[in-house]
Amino acid sequence: MNPLIFSTILATIIMGTAIVMTSSHWLTIWIGFEMNMLAIIPMLMKQHNPRSTEAATKYFLTQATASMLLMLAVIMNLTHTGQWTITKSFNPLASIIMTIALTMKLGLSPFHFWVPEVAQGIPLSSCLILLTWQKLAPLSILYMISPTINLNLLLSMSLISVAIGGWGGLNQTQLRKIMAYSSIAHMGWMTAILAYNPTMTMLNLLVYITMTTTMFMLLIKSASTTTLSLAIMWNKVPLVTTLTLTIMLSLGGLPPLTGFLPKWMIIQELTKNNNIIMPTLMAIMALLSLYFYMRLTYATTLTMFPTTNNMKMKWQFEPKKHMNLLSPLIVMSTLTLPLAPMMSLLD
């Protein structure tokens, strides 16, 4: 892609998200969402193949439907309150439609079907933007309207998302699909605590973006897109193999690593609010995600896939990719748990 065009598209994506996050007028928010959506479509189609075109079309149709529902909810609320600004008073039916629209943009279950399909058809760099940056705008609006959200609807969607995120990744061999299902599960955890403690949702989002960015940077560095390519990476970039598997376990929420921190805090917060069943079910379902990450780790380190010898000797002849941010991101993605006592300052 031409550097000038790429810079323009990237600036538009950033500007669209910034407009959504800083606006209090619904029409401006809608314009920001549309700018963001139309700008990212060329990023999804960088490879110019039918798979990328299909992924971009699915993304466009889903986001356009969500934007239509968002405007429907805004107009319904306009007839109820008589103003365009985000207010604490919200028509109950409009609130439900708004929640559905925003969860569709986030890829929350039961509107999650587009996420794995779109992620699988696009390059790793575009997939990174899709699963991290594109979550900021919808989550910021959910954060703003959190006092008016239908709690039962949001908690139900969160619980289903954690379950689907675990079940969906069990039989996957494509790393982009695994990351997509992991994203669905993490979104479930974030939205579960949104109505009780929105600040904790933002903290969870920060940890999720850090871990996912680290994971994708490692995959881009090693040019791995399947479990097979990950398994034969040991003689290509051995250190990166070890780090990739550690980040995977952190994403799964294994206790000594950073990924356990947000889950621990969310379970604690839900329990404080006398909601015992919800965190119990979510913790059980989180084991599904941890299982497929551990299975992937086992398959990569302790077994060898049936391949020919020349596949095992897969050397890295392409120029080395320099990633200056990778080292601090790896540290943050694995060693932040000791900072947990400082989180008491949030209370």
From Swiss-Prot:
- Under which main EC class is this enzyme filed? translocase
UniProt keywords (A-Z) are:
Electron transport, Membrane, Mitochondrion, Mitochondrion inner membrane, NAD, Respiratory chain, Translocase, Transmembrane, Transmembrane helix, Transport, Ubiquinone
| Compartments where located | Mitochondrion inner membrane
Where primarily located? mitochondrion
GO cellular component annotations, sorted alphabetically?
mitochondrial inner membrane
Q: What one GO molecular function would you report for this record?
A: NADH dehydrogenase (ubiquinone) activity
Query: Per its UniProt record, what InterPro entries does this chain match?
Result: Complex_I_Subunit_2 (IPR050175), NADH_DH_su2_C (IPR010933), NADH_UbQ_OxRdtase_chain2 (IPR003917), ND/Mrp_TM (IPR001750)
> How does the protein's chain sit in the membrane according to the entry?
Multi-pass membrane protein
Catalysis performed (reactions): a ubiquinone + NADH + 5 H(+)(in) = a ubiquinol + NAD(+) + 4 H(+)(out)
EC nos: 7.1.1.2
Specify whether Translocase is a keyword of the entry: yes
Pfam families, sorted: NADH_dehy_S2_C, Proton_antipo_M
The answer to whether the entry has keyword Disulfide bond is no
Q: Which BP terms from GO are recorded?
A: mitochondrial electron transport, NADH to ubiquinone; mitochondrial respiratory chain complex I assembly
Transmembrane ranges?
Answer: 1-21, 25-45, 59-79, 96-116, 127-147, 149-169, 178-198, 200-220, 247-267, 276-296, 325-345
Where are the disulfide bridges? Answer: none
Give the family per the record: Belongs to the complex I subunit 2 family.
User: What this chain does, per the record?
Assistant: Core subunit of the mitochondrial membrane respiratory chain NADH dehydrogenase (Complex I) which catalyzes electron transfer from NADH through the respiratory chain, using ubiquinone as an electron acceptor. Essential for the catalytic activity and assembly of complex I.
**Tell me, how does this one assemble?**
Core subunit of respiratory chain NADH dehydrogenase (Complex I) which is composed of 45 different subunits. Interacts with TMEM242.
Which PANTHER family does this entry report, sorted A to Z?
A: NADH-UBIQUINONE OXIDOREDUCTASE CHAIN 2 (PTHR46552:SF1)
Protein's name in the database: NADH-ubiquinone oxidoreductase chain 2
Tell me what organism the protein belongs to. Answer: Natalus stramineus
What lineage is on file?
Eukaryota, Metazoa, Chordata, Craniata, Vertebrata
